[in-house]
From Swiss-Prot:
Pfam families with a match to the protein in the record: Ribosomal_L7Ae
Similarity-based family: Belongs to the eukaryotic ribosomal protein eS12 family.
Record's keyword terms, sorted: Ribonucleoprotein, Ribosomal protein
Encoding gene (name): RPS12
Designated name of the protein: Small ribosomal subunit protein eS12
Listed GO MF terms: structural constituent of ribosome
Superkingdom of origin organism: Eukaryota
Length: 132
């Protein structure tokens, strides 16, 4: 389990890398959003990474996701804001200028398919290896 607060100096932050990686995975239809989809993907071991909203009100949701991630040894990142996670996962409507409107709160997102090689993906993988 990894907290998203740590930031390597001189590089993009972990949250910036996470945002880019989620955007790439979303374009390649590689995200499972919400508790139901995420728990199924984690249980089937289809997940490469899991992102959990720390501010989730249901403690049972958090315990389930943390338990599935630790059981299957899937990296877990916690983010502080569910609205921000919902925006990164594509649970919003974009207006003409490209700004997010009507953002839906998201409790959990699982990356099933990274999409393509990217610097954000490599940074996250290096981050997971150094935090273990």
């Amino acid at each position: 389990m990894v907290s998203a607060d740590a930031t390597p100096k001189g590089q993009m932050t972990v949250l910036d890398a996470l945002k880019g990686a989620l955007r790439t995975a979303l374009m390649h239809d590689g995200l499972a959003r919400g508790l139901r989809e995420a728990s199924k993907a984690l249980d089937r071991r289809e997940a490469h990474m899991c992102v959990l909203n720390e501010a989730c009100e249901e403690e049972a949701y958090k315990k389930l996701i943390v338990a599935l991630c630790s059981e299957h040894k899937i990296p877990l990142i916690k983010v502080p804001d569910g609205k921000q996670l919902g925006e990164w996962a594509g649970l919003c409507v974009l207006d003409r200028e490209g700004n997010a409107r009507k953002v839906v709160n998201c409790s959990c997102v699982v990356v099933k398919n990274w999409g393509e090689e990217s610097s954000e993906r490599m940074m996250l993988l290096n981050y997971f290896q150094t935090e273990q």
